[in-house]
Amino acid sequence: MEQYEKKGYLNSEFRLFHLTDQETKEVDYHYHDFDKITIFIRGKVNYMIEGRSYDLKPYDIVLVKQGDIHRLTVDNSCPYERIIVYISPNFMNAYQTDTYDLSYCFQKAAKEHSNVLRIPSFEKSSLFRSISQLEHSFTDGGYASELYRQVMFL
């Protein structure tokens, strides 16, 4: 069995990054000990997750469950822009009840054998507005800002 490198770290319940890279180095297969959601904005990217290949389109949502072996290949002829959310499994589990489960999207992705969601007109959706507000909340250092971010995320 091949050995894969664990990459990234998470020292909070969740973290959001908005990144744009003009040039991205090739990344070997790896895994994380947290869940990851990537909202692809622009670029030319192929994601390999657990042996399945996805050529991304703008505003695709990529779901990578903790422990999933994955890598991406980026065509550096154009900028690669995305929003990434790292989520602690403990955070997801803390909000699980009989009536709802925050990890449902990851479970459904596994069941349907597809780690990519395509939402028509994503930039017009309420999800897009919510993500934009959540992203903006990370610039606010006011009273209880971390709690505010958690509430927005939920």
Language-model region placement:
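A generic structural signal for short coil/turn motifs at secondary-structure boundaries
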Residues: 49, 73, 142-143
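Glycine-/small-residue-rich active-site loops that bind phosphorylated ligands and cofactors
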Residues: 54, 77, 141
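Amphipathic, well-ordered alpha-helical segments in soluble domains
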Residues: 36-39, 126-133, 152
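A hydrophobic/aromatic-rich effector-binding and dimerization subdomain
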Residues: 2-15, 73-138
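Generic protein-terminus/edge-of-domain signal
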Residues: 1-61, 68, 100-104, 111-115
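All-alpha amphipathic helical-bundle segments outside canonical DNA-binding/catalytic cores
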Residues: 122, 138-152
